[in-house]
Amino acid sequence: MFALPGYDAFLGFLLIAAAVPVLALVTNKLVAPKSRAGERQLTYESGMEPIGGAWIQFNIRYYMFALVFVIFDVETVFLYPWAVAFNRLGLLAFIEALIFIAILLVALAYAWRKGALEWS
């Protein structure tokens, strides 16, 4: 059917995977009610009307804690497969993991020294 016969099933799956969300969006546009007045235009948060404005001061410390968390969370993702296959891996893989952990400890010490982990 196509130039690469081994990929017919994959191409069919890809077409179906692309068509399903498009079909869902088109169906929603056709079936959804068209009312644009009254209650529909009001904003709400968690089922309640908001009080005050939406612009508030956001403490940058949340951002720094989140960034440090993401860095060390990704470290866990990289170290988990190594820990699972620890018995099959040799000494070289152990040394590589130690170097990886050492680099991350240097990054943690740097963040600590710069005050990224202090809440003030």
Curated annotation (Swiss-Prot):
Stretches that traverse the bilayer: 6-26, 64-84, 89-109
Gene3D superfamilies attached to this UniProt entry: NADH:ubiquinone/plastoquinone oxidoreductase, chain 3
GO CC field: NADH dehydrogenase complex; plasma membrane-derived thylakoid membrane
Keywords on record: Membrane, NAD, NADP, Plastoquinone, Quinone, Thylakoid, Translocase, Transmembrane, Transmembrane helix, Transport
PANTHER family on file: NADH-UBIQUINONE OXIDOREDUCTASE CHAIN 3
Protein function: NDH-1 shuttles electrons from an unknown electron donor, via FMN and iron-sulfur (Fe-S) centers, to quinones in the respiratory and/or the photosynthetic chain. The immediate electron acceptor for the enzyme in this species is believed to be plastoquinone. Couples the redox reaction to proton translocation, and thus conserves the redox energy in a proton gradient. Cyanobacterial NDH-1 also plays a role in inorganic carbon-concentration.
Protein name (Swiss-Prot/TrEMBL): NAD(P)H-quinone oxidoreductase subunit 3
